Each structure stands twice: as structure tokens, then as C-alpha cells.
Amino acid sequence: MKAIIVLLMVVTSNADRICTGITSSNSPHVVKTATQGEVNVTGVIPLTTTPTKSHFANLKGTKTRGKLCPNCLNCTDLDVALARPMCVGTIPSAKASILHEVRPVTSGCFPIMHDRTKIRQLPNLLRGYENIRLSTHNVINAEGAPGGPYRLGTSGSCPNVTSRNGFFATMAWAVPRDNKTATNPLTVEVPYICAKGEDQITVWGFHSDNKAQMKNLYGDSNPQKFTSSANGVTTHYVSQIGGFPNQTEDGGLPQSGRIVVDYMVQKPGKTGTIVYQRGVLLPQKVWCASGRSKVIKGSLPLIGEADCLHAKYGGLNKSKPYYTGEHAKAIGNCPIWVKTPLKLANGTKYRPPAKLLKER
């Protein structure tokens, strides 16, 4: 910043009197003011920055969650959310979470009709909680549920640590043992088993196949009806019979059937209900979740730390109070988006050098 020179010269004589006023060097700084429009000033401080794209980072001063289960190798977040065998582990607590799976999220183990329900939203629902844990006990006794006794079905595409066959830990595939006959709708109550103050996320579903397989497994080859109800939300489904091409998941045997998977959220102390016919996937282990975690769309890995996480620019450190560029969701200690750059005038209004005035 160039110095402002104030010079006042008064010369008194019988001759002419010459006066000069405030002068300064030429100023390149122009600011827009509310009352005078564009004004030249002697100095400014920039208040805005235009970020460049960078990698995402851990948010300073808080825990940031990338994958739901960092130690569950070769598992999608949906695998973890459904508790697929070999994809069960600890989900770290976090105040901020990264939505990092940009393509349609799928799960292995058994062919799922993902588009029939909101099941792809389950990982995002879990990300929105600070603390998430899978219950150690099953919410109901599936083998003795109404319409049973049942044996619990497994799949060769779901190997667990002790067997070549397994299934999702959140659900039990209820196959009638001896009473393979059609049934009227049956009702099972789903109790609340989480700790006080936790939301309970209960996963359930149903299996359907071609007519021959439905008759063999359940004794009924007709479409089956299913309903879930919890927290004032009721959902109805009717199973599709046949019409599925064979599909193989993760090197297992080709499957002619499909499963439809959904979930319901039970608030503290509230009981849920499931009304079902043949082919039901009864709930088993449930998610218990509490607190809130801010979620932002991003990418992995998380490298270093940043003041702010921005959906378009990644990790940002706050060097200025405002920023220009793309406006998008951001979390943390973030600059404020403005349309045009802002400057703080820290000098005075520029005045051109005063002209010499001659008085007689």
C-alpha cells in the first residue's frame, strides 16, 4: 500500500498566493459501494477465494467416516448394511460421513430386486447416525414364528466362516419344514430390543421364484402378500412369480429366484409388525443407531485433514471468509459462497493530485 502524502503549503506575499491540497499516487483498486457505485481506493484486502478441486479429507476436530466398515474387505456398504457373511464388523462412530458409492449400489450373496424397494437407501440411512451397532441377539425366533416350524434357508453364494452356505445376518429365510401348504396372512410382532434412545432399523423381505420352486419350497405357487408397519409407515408388497433369468452371485450356483428386501425404522420403545405368507425373510439382528452424522457426497480415500468438506471441491482449508465458483453442499468450518468477489477497503478514497490554483 502506497503512503498517502498530506501537504498543505501556504505562501503569503504581496504576490500571488498558491495552495495545494491532498494528493496520492494513482490507485488500481476499484470497489463497488452501496451509495457511490464504483470508487477508487488506495488499498483493499481480498475476502474471497476460488477453490480448486482436491481430494477429500478428514474433517478437523471430528471423526469422519468413509466406508461403513473399514475392515470389511471386498464388501459394499450395502453388504455391510444387510450383514452379509464375511461383511460383518465394527462401524466406527463419526460426526461426518462420506457418501462415496456413486454407481447403483448392489449386494452379493443372493440376487436382490433392488428397484422394488428403498433398500439402496439403507447405507445412507445408517451413515446419518453418529453411532451404529448391530444387535448381538435376534429380534424374533424365526424357526418358531407363526406358520412354522421353519428351517432356515441358506445360499452357496453366502459362505460364512464355518460353512460354505450362509445368509444375511439381518434376515432368516423361513422355509416350512413339514407343513408345505398355502397359508392365510400371518402376523409377527417385532419388539424393540435396542437401548433407550436408539432408533431400531429392522431389515426384512421375501423370496419368490418360478412356480415349480415355489411349490417345492412352500407348497404354494401363487403370488404371496406381505405388509410391514412401524412408526406410522405401512408398506404393502405382492410377490412376482417366475419370469426371472438365472443369475449368479459371486461364483455361486445360478439362482432362478429373487429376494425383495426392505427395512423399517422403529423409534424407541415402539413395536413393529410384519404380515406375511410363504417365502418371508423374517428379521433377525437389527441395527441400533443414535446421534447424528452429517453426510456429504464425496470420494475415498480420505487424505489428511481439512476445515471444510465441499461436494464439488473436496477438502478445503478456510483461508478467506467467502468463496466464489460452484455452489454446493459443504460441511465443517466453511467459507460462505458469494456470486462475485468481495473486497474490504482498508485505505482511503483516492483523489487525483490537486491542481495549482492561482489567486490574485
Swiss-Prot record:
Briefly state the modifications made to the protein after translation. Answer: In natural infection, inactive HA is matured into HA1 and HA2 outside the cell by one or more trypsin-like, arginine-specific endoprotease secreted by the bronchial epithelial cells. One identified protease that may be involved in this process is secreted in lungs by club cells. Palmitoylated.
Q: List the disulfide bonds.
A: none
Matching entries from SUPFAM superfamilies are given as:
Viral protein domain (SSF49818)
GO cellular component annotations of the record:
host cell plasma membrane; membrane; viral envelope; virion membrane
Localization of this protein: Virion membrane; Host apical cell membrane
Q: Which domain of life is it from?
A: Viruses
Signal peptide residues are: 1-15
Q: Name one GO biological process term.
A: fusion of virus membrane with host endosome membrane
Question: What protein name is recorded for this chain?
Answer: Hemagglutinin
What organism does this protein naturally occur in?
Answer: Influenza B virus (strain B/Victoria/103/1989)
Q: How does it sit in the membrane?
A: Single-pass type I membrane protein
| Source taxonomy | Viruses, Riboviria, Orthornavirae, Negarnaviricota, Polyploviricotina
Subunit relationships: Homotrimer of disulfide-linked HA1-HA2.
InterPro entries, alphabetized: Capsid_hemagglutn, Hemagglutn_HA1_a/b_dom_sf, Hemagglutn_influenz_A/B
What's this protein's family per the entry?
Belongs to the influenza viruses hemagglutinin family.
| Miscellaneous information on this protein | Major glycoprotein, comprises over 80% of the envelope proteins present in virus particle. The extent of infection into host organism is determined by HA. Influenza viruses bud from the apical surface of polarized epithelial cells (e.g. bronchial epithelial cells) into lumen of lungs and are therefore usually pneumotropic. The reason is that HA is cleaved by tryptase clara which is restricted to lungs. However, HAs of H5 and H7 pantropic avian viruses subtypes can be cleaved by furin and subtilisin-type enzymes, allowing the virus to grow in other organs than lungs.
Q: Which GO terms describe its molecular function?
A: host cell surface receptor binding
UniProt entry keywords in alphabetical sequence: Disulfide bond, Fusion of virus membrane with host endosomal membrane, Fusion of virus membrane with host membrane, Glycoprotein, Hemagglutinin, Host cell membrane, Host membrane, Host-virus interaction, Lipoprotein, Membrane, Palmitate, Signal, Transmembrane, Viral attachment to host cell, Viral envelope protein, Viral penetration into host cytoplasm, Virion, Virus entry into host cell
Functional note: Binds to sialic acid-containing receptors on the cell surface, bringing about the attachment of the virus particle to the cell. Plays a major role in the determination of host range restriction and virulence. Class I viral fusion protein. Responsible for penetration of the virus into the cell cytoplasm by mediating the fusion of the membrane of the endocytosed virus particle with the endosomal membrane. Low pH in endosomes induce an irreversible conformational change in HA2, releasing the fusion hydrophobic peptide. Several trimers are required to form a competent fusion pore.
Positions annotated with a glycan in the UniProt record: N40, N74, N160, N179, N246, N317, N346
Q: Which Pfam families does UniProt cross-reference here? A: Hemagglutinin (PF00509)
